[in-house]
Swiss-Prot record:
Pathway in which the depicted protein is active: Purine metabolism; GMP biosynthesis; GMP from XMP (L-Gln route): step 1/1
Pfam families: GATase (PF00117), GMP_synt_C (PF00958), tRNA_Me_trans (PF03054)
Keyword Membrane carried by entry: no
Entries under InterPro entries matching the protein: Class_I_gatase-like, GATASE, GMP_synth_C, GMP_synth_GATase, GMP_synthase, GMPS_ATP_PPase_dom, Rossmann-like_a/b/a_fold
This protein's name: GMP synthase [glutamine-hydrolyzing]
Keywords: ATP-binding, Glutamine amidotransferase, GMP biosynthesis, Ligase, Nucleotide-binding, Purine biosynthesis
Organism, as annotated: Moorella thermoacetica (strain ATCC 39073 / JCM 9320)
Length: 516
């Protein structure tokens, strides 16, 4: 796993107490040039200390410190001398553990809030006396623990920040990791560099060196099979493994029949000719579609596709002779969204939740703890083509989760044509790299329309386009009206069985980016 070989390098650990955005904390720390990992809150103290972290951050979470079964830590951690920053629930836990008082508020404080800095403190050094921050909490600290000073407050939160510099213990009730706290990154940097004394020398280049060495240790003299999709994730994973083991890597590209228009041919050209890797093309489209016949539940679709993927790779491995490892381009958001002990499952990812328990190949997931923007930087550093590095994310289950309900050949053809128009027009408008994802969704219901002099009863197409940095939060893209008009007009006129186009203007949260 990434980071296991970084015992002698500086690392800041984020203890996960269950908030869905907790991985953003690790991302912001890495943006400051400090390597960070998120680990379970109940990781044994000896394991935490063995990592020799320069600092520890307690994340937010949905629990109340007084709830039965609320997440707890070994209180000896406070006496370890390691600097600790508690965020939201993390600060409340610190206050509760060390003798402060936490109470339930009559109402939640949620959203943008003005923070008044009330005392000198390393976290706020050089910042204005009043700054905007993002709050999301029900409980609040009414009295800090002995030895702590209150360093900030808001209109509804008397202890919005507190610190005990002598023990290097700090807490903030707001969320510095989100962009709605404009000075949040500066606050985190002050904790990292002023309090923890970090150097900030982690980089993409150092990651590549560490990961190549880790892959070589894991693989030894074994042979490796890569699950290649042509997307940036599997492409960068393949390039990393190829750098580590060379021609002992065979890339298998499976056409599951759920790809976009022209995608199978494009991937074969790009990787077989341009990158010089061993590519095996497998057309398993009929097999996948037969398995999906009659299946309407999105979770079942994902698990069926994940299961069949692994089975196909196992069959190819047997054809190739001895193969020991399987590469997947699993990313950090995949792991987080598939659920941890303290975070509810949003949806299972085919790279994570759908793997058969009797899988015969050992997994290599070199990108498992990277965010998408970090993966792109790794890809550029490895010299991958721009059209691969900057390709928009595409889900492993493909169009199966953009067709609501049962997947049929007819629906696939409808969606392929509509999706191709969306991509073509977004590119033509020069917005492709600015938008995180832009695609079409085919719902299962139909609506009434009029085309010519005839009444129609046909499918709508849902247009989805979002902006994001990491897929953990996303906002709907404010596409120009004339662009929306062109997309709608072309789809209705060029794609049969479609009589309506609607635009999804829901952010994440409360929605997810994909519809299934």
């Amino acid at each position: 796993m990434i980071g296991e070989n970084k015992q002698l390098a500086e690392i800041v650990l984020v203890l996960d107490f269950g908030g869905q955005y907790n991985q953003l904390i690790a991302r912001r720390v890495r943006e400051a040039g400090v390597y960070s990992e998120m680990i379970p809150y109940n990781t044994p103290l000896e394991k935490i200390l063995a990592r020799r972290p320069r600092g520890i951050i307690f994340s937010g979470g949905p629990a109340s410190v007084y709830s039965l079964g609320a997440p707890r830590i070994d209180r000896a951690l406070y006496e370890s001398g390691i600097p600790i920053l508690g965020i939201c629930y993390g600060m409340q836990l610190m206050a509760h553990d060390l003798g402060g008082r936490v109470e339930g508020a009559s109402g939640r404080e949620y959203g943008k809030t003005q923070l008044e800095i009330t005392a000198a403190d390393p976290l706020f050094a050089g910042l204005p006396e009043s700054i905007q921050c993002w709050m999301s909490h029900g409980d609040y600290i009414s009295a800090p623990p002995p030895g702590f000073q209150v360093t900030a407050r808001s209109a509804y939160t008397p202890v919005a920040a507190m610190s005990d510099p002598a023990r290097k213990l700090y807490g903030v009730q707001f969320h510095p990791e989100v962009k709605h706290t404009p000075m949040g990154q500066e606050i985190l940097r002050r904790f990292l560099f002023q309090v923890c004394g970090c150097r900030g020398d982690w980089s993409v280049s150092s990651f590549i060196e560490d990961q190549v060495a880790a892959i070589r240790r894991q693989v030894g003299n074994g042979r490796v099979l890569c699950a290649l999709s042509g997307g940036v994730d599997s492409s960068v994973a393949a390039a990393l493994v190829h750098r580590a083991v060379g021609d002992r890597l065979t890339c298998v590209f499976v056409n599951h029949g759920l790809l976009r228009q022209g995608e199978a041919e494009q991937v074969q050209r790009a990787f077989g000719q341009a990158m010089g890797m061993n590519i095996v093309y497998v057309d398993a489209s009929r097999r996948f579609l037969e398995k999906l016949t009659g299946v309407t539940d999105p979770e079942e679709k994902r698990k069926i596709i994940g299961h069949e993927f692994i089975r196909v790779f196992e069959e190819e491995a047997r054809k190739l002779g001895r193969v020991d490892f399987l590469v997947q381009g699993t990313l950090y958001p995949d792991v987080i969204e598939s659920g941890t002990e303290t975070a509810a499952v949003i949806k299972s990812h085919h790279n994570v939740g759908g793997l058969p328990e009797d899988m015969e190949l050992e997994l290599i997931e070199p990108l498992r703890l990277l965010f998408k923007d970090e993966v792109r930087r790794v890809g550029e550093e490895l010299g991958l083509p721009e059209e691969i590095v900057w390709r928009q994310p595409f889900p492993g289950p493909g169009l199966a989760i953009r067709i609501l309900g049962e997947v049929t050949p007819e629906k696939l053809e409808i969606l392929r044509q509509a999706d191709a128009i969306v991509t073509e027009e977004i590119r033509r408008a020069g917005l492709y790299r600015e938008i995180w994802q832009s695609f079409a969704v085919l719902p299962s219901m139909k609506s009434v329309g009029v085309m010519g002099d005839e009444r129609t009863y046909a499918y709508p197409i849902v247009l989805r386009a979002v902006t994001s940095d990491d897929a953990m939060t996303a906002d709907w893209a404010r596409l120009p009206y004339d662009l929306l008009e062109r997309i709608s007009s072309r789809i209705v006129n060029e794609v049969r069985h479609i009589n309506r186009v609607v635009y999804d203007i829901t952010s994440k949260p409360p929605a997810t980016i994909e519809w299934e």
